[in-house]
């Protein structure tokens, strides 16, 4: 098995390369907040020497309640993304939910994300593939790691092999997620880059009646465990005031802790990738 390298400008995304941070905020709450959060991430990652891609959503189409905040929408969201890219010279990642969104979004962002709940929607997969953009596939909470090969095949047959696989936890009974560390290693055997969404994996789906709960206090422990696997990247969301975030605040890392948090993740990644591989199958 060889590790596939995805080139994003000067950034190399691969399981045996230094990890790439995919980070930002859950949903675009306002232009000013997005700019402020992007600036913090840009400054911290530049200081620590971590390759970085800014993440946010323009629409949260799968909220638990019809009354929950969804975002500014595609048109306004893309304007904010363009300003972030121009101001901070950052590559961007965002998710799409409908086939018609794929082409216009891919004109602005560098990586388009297939949401976990939509990962088997063939029309959406094909529309995403045809953009030629790099694709981040969120592993559905209800699929086994080895079933990701079917989604990969769909993208391949639609003409796109620039694929990243993202672990974000698996259903464990009702209102709970667990992370299968061996499952991430199994996905790595595909050769495609594997990243770990360490904040969404903290969710308790439906845990707050009309929205998801979370376990923010365990954000460091879970991320440390994932980084010990030697992954292509880490996916996190942070907020300056998580308790008042408009989406997934219970899972969000407090923004003021970002630098110390990433220092630890980089130290683990550097250490693990300095080791010679050991083949215990023989």
Swiss-Prot record:
EC number(s) reported in the record: 2.5.1.55
Main enzyme class: transferase
Keyword field: Cytoplasm, Lipopolysaccharide biosynthesis, Transferase
Entry keyword annotation includes Cytoplasm: yes
Pathway assigned in UniProt: Carbohydrate biosynthesis; 3-deoxy-D-manno-octulosonate biosynthesis; 3-deoxy-D-manno-octulosonate from D-ribulose 5-phosphate: step 2/3; Bacterial outer membrane biogenesis; lipopolysaccharide biosynthesis
GO terms for biological process, alphabetical: keto-3-deoxy-D-manno-octulosonic acid biosynthetic process
Pfam families named in the record: DAHP_synth_1
Subcellular location: Cytoplasm
One GO CC annotation: cytoplasm
Principal cellular location given in the protein's record: cytoplasm
SUPFAM superfamilies with a match to the protein in the record: Aldolase (SSF51569)
MF terms (GO), sorted A to Z: 3-deoxy-8-phosphooctulonate synthase activity
Transmembrane stretches, start-end: none
Catalytic activity reported: D-arabinose 5-phosphate + phosphoenolpyruvate + H2O = 3-deoxy-alpha-D-manno-2-octulosonate-8-phosphate + phosphate
Keyword Transferase: yes
Family according to the record: Belongs to the KdsA family.
PANTHER family listed in its UniProt record: PHOSPHO-2-DEHYDRO-3-DEOXYHEPTONATE ALDOLASE
Protein name per Swiss-Prot or TrEMBL: 2-dehydro-3-deoxyphosphooctonate aldolase
Gene source species: Shewanella sp. (strain MR-4)
């Amino acid at each position: 098995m060889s590790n596939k390298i995805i080139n994003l400008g000067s950034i190399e995304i691969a399981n045996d390369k230094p990890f790439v941070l995919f980070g930002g905020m859950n949903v675009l709450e306002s232009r000013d907040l997005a700019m402020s959060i992007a600036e913090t991430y840009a400054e911290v990652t530049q200081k620590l020497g971590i390759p970085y891609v800014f993440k946010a959503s323009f629409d949260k189409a799968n909220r638990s309640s019809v009354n929950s905040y969804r975002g500014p929408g595609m048109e306004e969201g893309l304007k904010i993304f363009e300003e972030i890219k121009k101001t901070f010279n950052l590559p961007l990642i965002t998710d799409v939910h409908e086939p018609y969104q794929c082409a216009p979004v891919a004109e602005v962002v560098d990586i388009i994300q297939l949401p976990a709940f939509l990962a088997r929607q063939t029309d959406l997969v094909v529309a995403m593939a045809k953009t030629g953009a790099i694709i981040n596939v969120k592993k559905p909470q209800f699929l086994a790691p080895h079933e990701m090969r079917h989604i990969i095949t769909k993208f391949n047959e639609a003409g796109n092999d620039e694929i990243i696989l993202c672990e974000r936890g698996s259903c464990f009974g009702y209102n709970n997620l667990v992370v299968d560390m061996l499952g991430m290693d199994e996905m790595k055997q595909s050769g495609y880059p594997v990243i770990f969404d360490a904040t969404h994996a903290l969710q308790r789906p439906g845990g707050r009646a009309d929205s998801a709960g979370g376990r923010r206090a365990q954000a460091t422990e879970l991320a440390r465990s994932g980084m010990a696997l030697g992954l292509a990247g880490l996916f996190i969301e942070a907020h300056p005031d998580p308790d008042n975030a408009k989406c997934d605040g219970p899972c969000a890392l407090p923004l003021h802790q970002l630098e110390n948090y990433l220092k630890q993740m980089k130290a683990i990644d550097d250490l693990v990738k300095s080791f010679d591989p050991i083949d215990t199958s023989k």
